[in-house]
């Protein structure tokens, strides 16, 4: 303080001012400090001082030819004196203005393409809507967010290869463009940037913005998709928030959102199939999101959602080491435990076998609407500090923490029996049983938990069993805080294993994820999700199952008809017929199947009594386990459009209608495709299929013994000849082919040759 006063006094004297402004600086240390090295020591001062000079800029000599010495106002634009120590010209800032107004223009066509992300951002802001500003306490928690809207999802290495290929195609160095997205982007960008005059380095920087996801760990209280993050500084402060609706969507946010929906649908569907893991993989590999293979997106996209992580684990990818319980992400921050099985009794005297975690541990819990810090010991909650958007969200977090603590008073609070099942009708494990029970009704849990008086701690208040705040007492060990708990910031990924029931474990055997953790929330995807797997046919309801089943048979008719005649059991077990069974009334499934299989067997024995259309029509019914009964049916019922509709065994119906003239099949009025061969040729279709792999040599030749039935053909050795009985009792001579390569053409030529041989 004294010093400052002294300085003020000194400054008020004119002599002091004179010394400071007029004296030259000649102290070596000072000169050294400001002149050594290339780094500017005081950029702001340097800039001010330079701009005060007449010619602060130096330019190449060529400038003299390109810029006049004076502008229209007669002001000098450059000096005739050379820049000291170089052969450059000294130039006035006015020359820059002149150049901008009168200098040569280049084509602007590439700017929107190179600076695409900026142009798009301007559009989003132009069309965005800013609402009112609200002043209130902001509970922000740090989350890893995407700060770069409109990017593809390439890894840094993949992007580097694309950028080198686009911007510096002649540079030496091996570049391997393997993924589909890399190739597409490279091709597209090369075309867009033909004859581009913008500095290559700039183009490279901008391409990087477009190709790579950039994430930062930022405090956020609202939306976390990249179109909200780009305006974070406009929408939330320490004590205020401004409502904002983005003026456009970007593909990367849409991909994230659609990926989560696809993954949830796939996990839910896989859970109910016979082999969940195999089904999940089959679905991931056959699904496309916005035209890109789901497995490619999973490899590149860092989204950390439960269903997405289960799919990643199944593909053998690393995932985050945090685990999920009750929709919250738990991350252990200190302590350790080992598990041991214990039997406990509920308030209803039901015995539960639970894996008890013994030892002291601390966790952060992060959910969509609430976060918490949990400290626990063996079967005991020591402290829980929660923060959340509203009472409901806070209650959700408290229930999850209380169940997770495995405390006895929680187990004793169970009223009634625990018998929750998952989608596949299997009982849930005990921890999830407890969770579901209290999520339905936590009243008894909160009442029995116990309350304690609390100290007055800044930023923390108590919460009563009915979830109202209090400054005097609180649920034992539980406090509500104004401050949120940050998400786990590390992006570290660990190797995990997955069992066939989709339970994901870390290398120590702790369960990180299971299908029970997958949210039941339904949403509408932003990008088109195409599930090619038959397991997902039912996602659009019974009609889609019906149409898809018949379309599948028609598309694969060539192979289906061979199996139909040679290996029907294998055909009936195909998973493509699984969804169809849900349409057939339960009581009738076995009877229908028995009836159709018998019918098919008669067709095989007495060739010539069937037509292709009828096989296609009845085939899905044969897939159910058959009941042996003598029942005959003239029509079969399927449950679509909320009621039973009939498929006629012989003839057309609104459900299944084949038009002989156009050879097209209509299912429930929707076109289901064309049959490529002519079903009117009676048996030719199946015979040519059966005779694939055989060459038809001509009419019967008695030297080769009695005529075999078509089913006996499979015993022939390659190159062996035999007579075979086909169609309406005709016999032809065939030879089993020596090679398999020509099999494909057989079915076409067989039909013609059979005709020739018979005639």
From Swiss-Prot:
This is Polymerase basic protein 2. Keywords: Cap snatching, Eukaryotic host gene expression shutoff by virus, Eukaryotic host transcription shutoff by virus, Host gene expression shutoff by virus, Host nucleus, Host-virus interaction, Inhibition of host RNA polymerase II by virus, mRNA capping, mRNA processing, Viral transcription, Virion. It comes from Influenza A virus (strain A/Chicken/Shantou/4231/2003 H5N1 genotype V). Pfam families: Flu_PB2_1st, Flu_PB2_2nd, Flu_PB2_3rd, Flu_PB2_4th, Flu_PB2_5th, Flu_PB2_6th, Flu_PB2_7th. A motif (Nuclear localization signal) lies at residues 736-739. One of its GO terms (molecular function) is RNA binding. It is found in: Virion; Host nucleus. Belongs to the influenza viruses PB2 family. GO terms for cellular component: host cell nucleus; virion component. One of its GO terms (biological process) is symbiont-mediated suppression of host mRNA transcription via inhibition of RNA polymerase II activity. Plays an essential role in transcription initiation and cap-stealing mechanism, in which cellular capped pre-mRNAs are used to generate primers for viral transcription. Recognizes and binds the 7-methylguanosine-containing cap of the target pre-RNA which is subsequently cleaved after 10-13 nucleotides by the viral protein PA. Plays a role in the initiation of the viral genome replication and modulates the activity of the ribonucleoprotein (RNP) complex. Gene3D superfamilies: Polymerase Basic Protein 2, C-terminal domain. Influenza RNA polymerase is composed of three subunits: PB1, PB2 and PA. Interacts (via N-terminus) with PB1 (via C-terminus). Interacts with nucleoprotein NP (via N-terminus). The record marks 627 as: Avian adaptation. The gene is PB2.
């Amino acid at each position: 303080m004294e010093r400052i006063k002294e300085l003020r006094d000194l400054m008020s004297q004119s002599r002091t001012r004179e010394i400071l402004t007029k004296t030259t600086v000649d102290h070596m240390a000072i000169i050294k400090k400001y002149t050594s090295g290339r780094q500017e020591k005081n950029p702001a001062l340097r800039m001010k001082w330079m701009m005060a000079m007449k010619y602060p800029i130096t330019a190449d000599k060529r400038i003299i030819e390109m810029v006049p010495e004076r502008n229209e106002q007669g002001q000098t634009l450059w000096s005739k004196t050379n820049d000291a120590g170089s052969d450059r010209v000294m130039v006035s800032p006015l020359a820059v203005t002149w150049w901008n107004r009168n200098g040569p223009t280049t084509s602007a066509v590439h700017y929107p393409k190179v600076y695409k992300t900026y142009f798009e951002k301007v559009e989003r802001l132009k069309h965005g809507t800013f609402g009112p500003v609200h002043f209130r306490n902001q509970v922000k928690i740090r989350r890893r967010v995407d700060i770069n809207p409109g990017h593809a999802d390439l890894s840094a290495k993949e992007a580097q290869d694309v950028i080198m290929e686009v911007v510096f195609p002649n540079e030496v160095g091996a570049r391997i463009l393997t993924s589909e997205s890399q190739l597409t982007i490279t091709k597209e960008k090369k075309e867009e940037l033909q004859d581009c005059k913008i500095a290559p380095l700039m183009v490279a920087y901008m391409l990087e913005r477009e190709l790579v996801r950039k994430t930062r760990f930022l405090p956020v209280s609202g939306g976390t998709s990249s179109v909200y993050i780009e305006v974070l500084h406009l929408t939330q402060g320490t004590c205020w928030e401004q409502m904002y609706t983005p003026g456009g969507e970007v593909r990367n946010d849409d991909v994230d959102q659609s990926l989560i929906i696809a993954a949830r649908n796939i996990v839910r569907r896989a859970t109910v199939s016979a082999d969940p893991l195999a089904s999940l993989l089959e679905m991931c590999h056959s699904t496309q999101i916005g035209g890109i293979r789901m497995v490619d997106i999973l490899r590149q996209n860092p989204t950390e959602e439960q269903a997405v992580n289960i799919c990643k684990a199944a593909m053998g990818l690393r995932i985050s080491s945090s685990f999920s319980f009750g929709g919250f992400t738990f991350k252990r921050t200190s302590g350790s435990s080992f598990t041991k099985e214990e039997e406990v009794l509920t308030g209803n005297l039901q015995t539960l076998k639970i894996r008890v975690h013994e030892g002291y541990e601390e966790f952060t819990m992060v959910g969509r609407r609430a976060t918490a810090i949990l400290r626990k010991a063996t079967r005991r909650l020591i402290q829980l500090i929660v923060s959340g958007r509203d009472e409901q969200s806070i209650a959700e977090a408290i229930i999850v923490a209380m169940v997770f603590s495995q405390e006895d008073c929680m187990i004793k609070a169970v009223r009634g029996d625990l018998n929750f099942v998952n989608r596949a009708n299997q009982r849930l494990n005990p921890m999830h049983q407890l969770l579901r029970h209290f999520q339905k009704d936590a009243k008894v849990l909160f009442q029995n938990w116990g309350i304690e008086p609390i100290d007055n701690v800044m930023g923390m208040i108590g919460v009563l069993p009915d979830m109202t705040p209090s400054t005097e007492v609180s649920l034992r060990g539980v406090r509500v805080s104004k401050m949120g708990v940050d998400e786990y910031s590390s992006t570290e990924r660990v190797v995990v294993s997955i069992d066939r029931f989709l339970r994901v474990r870390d290398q120590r055997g702790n369960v990180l994820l299971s299908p029970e953790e997958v949210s039941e929330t339904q949403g509408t995807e932003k990008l088109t999700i195409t599930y090619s797997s038959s397991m997902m046919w039912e996602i659009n309801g019974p009609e889609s199952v019906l149409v898809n089943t018949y379309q599948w048979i028609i598309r694969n008719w060539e192979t289906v008809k061979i199996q139909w005649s040679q290996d029907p059991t294998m055909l009936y077990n195909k998973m493509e017929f699984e969804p169809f069974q849900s349409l057939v009334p339960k009581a009738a499934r076995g009877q229908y199947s028995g009836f159709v299989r018998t019918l098919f067997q008669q067709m095989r024995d007495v060739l010539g009594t069937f037509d292709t259309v009828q096989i296609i029509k009845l085939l899905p019914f044969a897939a159910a386990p058959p009941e042996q009964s003598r029942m005959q049916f003239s029509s079969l019922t399927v449950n679509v459009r909320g009621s039973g509709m009939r498929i006629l065994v012989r003839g057309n119906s609104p459900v299944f209608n084949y038009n002989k003239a156009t050879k097209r099949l209509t299912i429930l009025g929707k076109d289901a495709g064309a049959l490529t061969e002519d079903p009117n040729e009676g048996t030719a279709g199946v015979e040519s299929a059966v005779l694939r792999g055989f060459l038809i040599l001509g009419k019967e030749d008695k030297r080769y013994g009695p005529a075999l039935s078509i089913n006996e053909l499979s015993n022939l050795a390659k190159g062996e000849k035999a007579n075979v009985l086909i169609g309406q009792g005709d016999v032809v001579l065939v030879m089993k082919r020596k090679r398999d390569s020509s099999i494909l053409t057989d079915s076409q030529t067989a039909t013609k040759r059979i005709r020739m041989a018979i005639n």
